[in-house]
Amino acid sequence: MASREEEQRETTPERGRGAARRPPTMEDVSSPSPSPPPPRAPPKKRLRRRLESEDEEDSSQDALVPRTPSPRPSTSTADLAIASKKKKKRPSPKPERPPSPEVIVDSEEEREDVALQMVGFSNPPVLIKHGKGGKRTVRRLNEDDPVARGMRTQEEKEESSEAESESTVINPLSLPIVSAWEKGMEAARALMDKYHVDNDLKANFKLLPDQVEALAAVCKTWLNEEHRGLQLTFTSNKTFVTMMGRFLQAYLQSFAEVTYKHHEPTGCALWLHRCAEIEGELKCLHGSIMINKEHVIEMDVTSENGQRALKEQSSKAKIVKNRWGRNVVQISNTDARCCVHDAACPANQFSGKSCGMFFSEGAKAQVAFKQIKAFMQALYPNAQTGHGHLLMPLRCECNSKPGHAPFLGRQLPKLTPFALSNAEDLDADLISDKSVLASVHHPALIVFQCCNPVYRNSRAQGGGPNCDFKISAPDLLNALVMVRSLWSENFTELPRMVVPEFKWSTKHQYRNVSLPVAHSDARQNPFDF
């Protein structure tokens, strides 16, 4: 109480120097006053109360309510003047809470005020919009709703144009970017439309490995238009067109840069045979030297093959009685060649490690290898390599499907030398074509047949699959050359098509065991219980 009375004395001026309503002069201020300074008004205590809104949806808010001080018995005029000069502080509003993702903004005015919008990485995703006034709204996006791009002002576009020009990659050719499959399909459809392929084949064509039939139809139409009456030697028209379709498929995949991991489109390989280097020496697919083995053939006298043998091979064929006392035509070949793994096997029987190569006449087989080598040198005289390679198919119609299982018998097409009858009587001086002279000087051809062929008037050995695949080595090379001509007539650039080199593998071995094969069944349970 004493201190409060002292503060009140300091606010009261001295008597004779002025009243409470008249402020003192400068002289009075300059002179020291023995009274203390006037006391300050005590701060108003504020009481925090919780006010409930009348609206049930709004949440309760906290407001600051000034607490009225308790009345005092005596209050001076100076205290009232000082208290009136102080401004009353307004209660600070509570910051707004962020809206929930359930809020949907659909008004046009709010859309115009949006300055930035982004997509939040949540589940479900939300579209977050920031207005120009600092307002932030959130809208939930459905799966089918398109994501709107952020709206930018013209000034922002001008500022970011330079940065975008540096990061944008421009196609120098100004061409649309397409996939490799679309590129191959476009080229294939152009060929099928031009050469009038069947609509069913065209509609089902998807550039798959097993769809060679549609491309073979293209090659067949092209042959009928450009090379009518094509001469083939020991080759069926169906096999020739099929091999052209395979080569065309390889060019399409190379053009579109489409590859399949476990499928080679041509179904061929280049074999470095080395069978024409040393006289009398032949090598099998293993790369080993083939051994000599006597081979005896017996045919019925009344059969067509027996009569032909008596006529064409009168020096070797003779009529004898077999062990059952019947007259047969017997041909004994002492120059037969077989794989080294078949030395202990009878004629026309092979071991489990054999490559399946067998020649009844080794000399004729070597003449056929010399013919294809001379044919390659005549066709490509300036080639540095490749004259000693043989383009050979690895798949016939039996094992042409991708992912086929090994079957009983030979796994590679059978390689057989065929003699050219009456070719020795031709005068070589009258022929100027070197490719034709290759067959005149070496009158035998290598012919590729089905892996396990079934001849006329004979039964299938082992009951394995068989087909009518048959094509000679020169015609196989001509099929590749004609596909290149077909491609050059329709496209400007010829892609690079690589035929793999042949390497021996255990998957090419002769199979003496027939494995059971399962067939797909749509039923869930095998039996009805």
Swiss-Prot record:
Domain commentary: The C-terminal arm bridges DBP molecules together, thereby creating a chain.
Keyword Glycosyltransferase on entry: no
Skewed-composition ranges (Acidic residues): 156-165
Modification Phosphotyrosine, positions: 195
Protein name per its UniProtKB record: DNA-binding protein
Functional summary from the UniProt entry: Plays a role in the elongation phase of viral strand displacement replication by unwinding the template in an ATP-independent fashion, employing its capacity to form multimers. Also enhances the rate of initiation. Released from template upon second strand synthesis. Assembles in complex with viral pTP, viral pol, host NFIA and host POU2F1/OCT1 on viral origin of replication. Covers the whole ssDNA genome during synthesis. The complementary strand synthesis induces its release from DNA template. May inhibit cellular transcription mediated by the interaction between host SRCAP and CBP.
GO biological process: DNA replication; DNA-templated transcription; positive regulation of DNA replication; viral DNA genome replication; viral DNA strand displacement replication
Start and end residues of each stretch annotated as Disordered: 1-108, 125-168
Major subcellular location class: host cell
Residues the entry annotates as binding Zn(2+) 1: 284, 286, 339, 355
Residue stretches of biased makeup (Basic residues): 129-139
Disulfide bonds: none
Basic and acidic residues bias spans: 1-17, 140-155
InterPro entries reported for this sequence: Ad_DBP_C_sf, ADBP_zn-bd_sf, Adenovirus_DNA-bd_a, Adenovirus_DNA-bd_N_sf, Adenovirus_DNA-bd_zn-bd, ADV_DNB2
Annotated keywords: DNA replication, DNA-binding, Early protein, Host nucleus, Host-virus interaction, Metal-binding, Phosphoprotein, Viral DNA replication, Zinc
Amino-acid positions noted as binding Zn(2+) 2 in the UniProt annotation, renumbered to this chain: 396, 398, 450, 467
Flexible loop: annotated span: 297-331
Known partners and oligomeric status: Homomultimerizes on viral ssDNA bound to pTP. Forms an initiation complex with viral polymerase, pTP and hosts NFIA and POU2F1/OCT1. Interacts with host SRCAP.
Ranges for region C-terminal arm, DBP binding: 513-529
GO annotation, cellular component aspect: nuclear viral factory; viral capsid
MF GO annotations: DNA binding; single-stranded DNA binding; zinc ion binding
Localization in the cell: Host nucleus
